[in-house]
Amino acid sequence: MQWIDDGLVIGLRKHGETGVVLELMTPEHGRHLGLVHGGRSRRMQPMLQPGNTLRATWRARLDGALGAYAVEPLTLNASRLMDSGLALYGVAHLSALLRLLPERDPHPALYEAAQILIAHLDDPEIAPALMVRFELALLAGLGFGLDLSHCAATGANDALVYVSPKSGRAVSASAGEPFRDRLLPLPPFLRDRDQPGSGWRTPDTQDVREGFTLTGYFLDQHVWRPRAQDTPEERARFVALGTGQS
């Protein structure tokens, strides 16, 4: 068995005296592990840092085996991101989110979103908002997507300012007003489908805080609490730095 794909480094662990088990997020083969012989050498270590993108060739005798990687550098982001505390926590949080995906389950859209996020993680003006969007996309990839397109009560697609914590669906201002204390805020930038580079406007800090409150609620309900986990420290630190709370 053999394939070649690009891969974002999201984790590694020691294996034997000189090797590592490398974990990549790839567009065509999903989250995939493989052994890198000599991965702990001085030559290989800088390449195998989380946040870097590699060209990987995976080989194994059987499809279900761990297999081995041969890797070449494509985009080495780690050295650039090391100078930013926000970026370092962002890489750690992004990697942890991607590790929630089932192994070998392709998610090409999430891979592309992760690459966009990595490219901007050291930009405090837009990285936090991009992370909120990525968390929403990850929830959808795990089967817990939110419906923010129209009001759950009226079907209208305007004046959407709340989200129901029970259904994960948007609620309009008029329909939600009597229950506002029980609803989650829907910040404007999550209703805006524009993307960076095409008229996308940077949301303000309060909007980003509300975005993290929204995604954090559903991540807690569907991901962390069922696993008996608290909010990961890397997320808490990224949110604090990204919203001016540290």
Swiss-Prot record:
Q: Is the Cytoplasm keyword given for this protein?
A: no
Record's keyword terms, sorted: DNA damage, DNA recombination, DNA repair
Can you cite an annotated GO cellular component?
Answer: bacterial nucleoid
Which biological process, per GO, is one annotated for this protein? double-strand break repair
Q: Which domain of life is it from?
A: Bacteria
Among its keywords, does the record have Iron?
no
State the similarity comment.
Answer: Belongs to the RecO family.
What protein is this chain from? DNA repair protein RecO
Q: What is the lineage of its organism?
A: Bacteria, Pseudomonadati, Pseudomonadota, Alphaproteobacteria, Hyphomicrobiales
State which gene encodes it: recO
